[in-house]
Amino acid sequence: MAKIIKEHILQLIEKGKRQDGRDLLEYRSDVSVEYGISPKTAEGSARVRIGETEVVAGVKMDISTPYPDSPNQGSIMVGAELSPFASDRFEMGPPSIESIELARVVDRGIRESGAMDFTKLCIKEGEMVWQVIIDMYPMNDAGNLRDACSLAALAALKDAKFPEFDKKTGKIDYYNRTKKSIPLEDEPIEVTVLKIHGDYIVDPSCEEEEFLDARLTVAFLKDGTICA
């Protein structure tokens, strides 16, 4: 980024303004959620746009063996794929530190909030449970991927339906889905705040993220309770 642009962004922040005209604690107003965008390849899916930032999330379900310390609970697994298609900052190859961190932030928001009742994912205690797999794919990174991925993951979970499962054979019929939804007790929403030279901003752009001194993502429940 050219030095003159950097100086301009920092000067605006010092004055309580930003490049796109927002106040420091003002979220982008153009937020949209689209459900069921990939009904043939995922049990649940969604697309989220926050400004020009776009993320697609999909939910797949599989059968697994429960962990020894939680024999009556299912599990979730969250992953994020950051490709050059979304930003020239990303590269093909093994998961980067950024993608691992992104997945962990979303995972913690869901897990620590208590939004999912994992006992309702149990098929046979100690032997067989459902595993919910959430994959997130940023399509365009215009800043604040954390919040966009979190919202996309939640939307995909809300859209998901269990596939047919034969307990006798232990086989899943992915071509036929039940009307049963994933048990969600609440809907945690994540908000990310950046500290830049002593000022705090929400919903940062890519350019603003380059100047961060610290970043904090907080998950809230519907009643305003901080849960993660």
Regions found by a protein language model. Name each.
Residues 1-228:
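Polyanion-binding surfaces on beta-sheet-dominated domains and ring/shell assemblies
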